[in-house]
């Protein structure tokens, strides 16, 4: 599928979600002076701190261009937030002249839910209707990875390296500082968060 996508000029993207913690420190190695090991502080959130302990983020890696697109979420990833992320991705790719995105992602419940599958079907039907009228649009071809195989998703190592790169060893970052560091590391603009629907 990836070879076909490349021959056809389609975009290929590996999508996933990740939590960026303000408290948990990543496992990492470092060099230090003899007898003076570098230690990461155990961080705690005070009761007055209103920021969340962790921020959820959707991401898409486009391996051919080495581009990562990020979109943070208010709350956690759920089906309707996933469809909002996919809609945003389509707008981004359409502005670059892309017509098809081969979307490679795992079998998370919010990827394979009835709501997301119906949205994908309706979206692709509306794309075909738009193409018949000469309107540009981006079709999505989802490819689900086998269960229990996150290492097949090429965006996963980027999350690990990103967490190590943005670490703050001695103090607790605010949610805004954390988001800015993540976006700076990946070279992405800070954009509005995807918000869950309020019933």
Placement of each model-derived feature along the sequence:
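Extended, low-complexity cationic-aromatic segments
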Residues: 1-87
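Short, solvent-exposed loop/turn segments at secondary-structure junctions
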Residues: 17-21, 62-66, 108-111, 148-151, ...
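Acidic/histidine-rich, metal-coordinating catalytic segments
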Residues: 97-112, 145, 153
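A short acidic (Asp/Glu
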Residues: 23-26, 112-117, 155
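Short, basic/hydrophobic alpha-helical segments
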Residues: 81-102
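RNase H-like polynucleotidyl transferase catalytic core
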Residues: 37-48, 123-157, 170-171
